[in-house]
A protein has these predicted regions:
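An anionic, glycine-rich sequence signature occurring as long contiguous blocks
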Residues: 4, 21, 147-173, 177, ...
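Catalytic-loop motifs flanking and including active-site residues across diverse enzymes
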Residues: 138, 330, 334, 357-363
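Short amphipathic alpha-helical "interface-anchor" segments enriched in bulky aromatics
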Residues: 107-111, 211, 252, 263, ...
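Conserved, well-structured functional cores that handle cations and Mg-NTP chemistry
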Residues: 2-206, 210-227, 234
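Intrinsically disordered or highly flexible coil/loop and linker segments, enriched in small
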Residues: 29, 33, 53, 201, ...
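Buried hydrophobic packing segments
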Residues: 142, 191, 338, 364-368
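Basic, amphipathic alpha-helical segments enriched in Lys/Arg and hydrophobic/aromatic residues
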Residues: 342-394
């Protein structure tokens, strides 16, 4: 991935104003009134700008408005469908980044630290963002990553039971009546189901151990014939060599000759080298699929281990499995870019619609930057190839 401080520069180099206008044409029609359509574009411009905090007053100033009332109307009361814009975003990402050979879907969550009790979904809950239990909102996200780049394509706000079971809080925050409690894994499955139904070109599903630890999640993917590579805790039990034991117990007995340094497929040389052990688990012969346990070991510290379970077509080379396992980190980069570049966590809204609208527009702005960066990179490569061709002919 390209460093964060180079993203906006890449956009400028590619002549991003015209490209942003084309993107706005894709989503502007989702707004009922022209005022909202125009303000969506200005909001995107504000998110793409270099203001330090992209909240109400700062955003209003950046887009040339006297006060934040217009921005607040766009997020809270204007008539437009954030889910329809999300679908437009997914099509945009697939159009520019889609690749059946290298595409993966990545699920993860992130926290948004908050004060008070009014913001929809806020509660004292654990988030990896803080590494602790804090007052925050938690959003589940789905990203698409390929050899061309990575961007978000879906999102879902997690509502704890303290919210779904409280009619007064729900009404005040504008939570739709049909919204019921769903745990984070169920939210991830719903997002994946939407991606599957839309035909997003992905060979694998990737997730960290929060999702991968659950047999039910892995079984859900297998029932749909979806290959996966998910992190798992060392305490998970797997059948190996006729005995079902904790992964850490199996690993303690591994001979040294099962380890080998593996460079993943699609490696650009920038990934850290690891030693890997790839162990066969049970086959799913009727579907032509197989399960594996992969163990990653640091070449510097043999005690630094990572564990993955994978399910995919028979004969999948270890280089591909290793590459897919490492693809999970692409969503971490997406979170860093979306929060650091386009203000995904800078909002001051409290209601259900406003959260989804702000986050969706941030996802759209981030995807735009990823696409512009890709175009700039491809243009630079074409120029290099052209210069080499001229030099050769000379």
């Amino acid at each position: 991935m390209v460093a964060q401080d180079g993203i906006a520069e890449s956009a400028a180099v590619a002549g991003w104003s015209e490209a942003l206008g084309e993107l706005h044409e894709r989503v502007g029609h989702r707004c009922v009134r022209s005022e909202a359509r125009k303000r969506v574009k200005r909001y995107l411009l504000g998110l793409l700008g270099r203001i330090e905090r992209k909240n109400g007053w700062r955003m209003a100033e950046a887009i040339g408005e006297r006060d934040p009332q217009g921005v607040q109307r766009l997020l809270n009361s204007a008539k437009w469908d954030a889910d329809a814009v999300r679908d437009d975003l997914r099509k945009y990402v697939v159009e520019h980044l889609g690749d059946q050979q290298t595409g993966v879907l990545i699920v993860d969550e992130t926290g948004f630290l908050k004060r008070g009790e009014k913001s929809v979904g806020v509660a004292r809950q654990y988030t990896g963002t803080a590494g602790d239990t804090v007052n925050c909102q938690v959003g589940a996200f789905l990203a698409y990553s390929s050899g061309k780049g990575a961007a978000f394509i879906d999102r879902a706000l997690y509502l704890p039971k303290g919210w779904t079971g409280d009619p007064a809080r729900r009404e005040e925050a504008g939570v739709p009546e049909e919204t019921v409690f769903r745990n984070k894994v169920e939210l991830a499955e719903e997002m994946l189901e939407r991606a599957f139904a839309a035909g997003v070109p992905a060979r694998w599903v990737v997730a960290d151990s929060f999702y991968g630890r659950l047999h039910s999640f892995r079984e859900w993917l297998e029932a749909r014939g979806r290959p996966y590579a998910v992190m798992v805790p060392k305490t998970n039990a797997v059948p190996l060599g006729g005995r079902k034991k904790k992964i850490e117990q199996h690993v303690e007995r591994l001979p040294e000759d099962v380890w080998s340094e593996v460079r993943p497929a699609q490696d650009d040389g920038g990934r850290r080298p690891w030693e890997w052990a790839c162990l066969d688990l049970a086959a799913d012969s009727e579907k032509g699929m197989r399960r594996w346990l992969l163990v990653r070991r640091s070449t510097d510290d043999p005690e630094d281990l990572g564990f993955y379970q994978a399910y995919g077509p028979e004969g999948t080379p270890i280089e591909e499995l290793v590459g897919v396992c490492q693809d999970r980190w692409a969503i971490e980069q997406c979170f860093a870019e979306a929060k650091g570049e386009v203000g995904m966590d800078h909002y001051e809204v409290r209601r259900w619609d406003a959260w989804h609208r702000h986050v969706t527009l941030c996802m759209l702005a981030h995807a735009f930057l990823v696409v512009v960066r890709l175009a700039a990179r491809e243009e630079e490569e074409a120029e290099r190839v052209g210069k080499r061709g001229i030099s050769t002919r000379a």
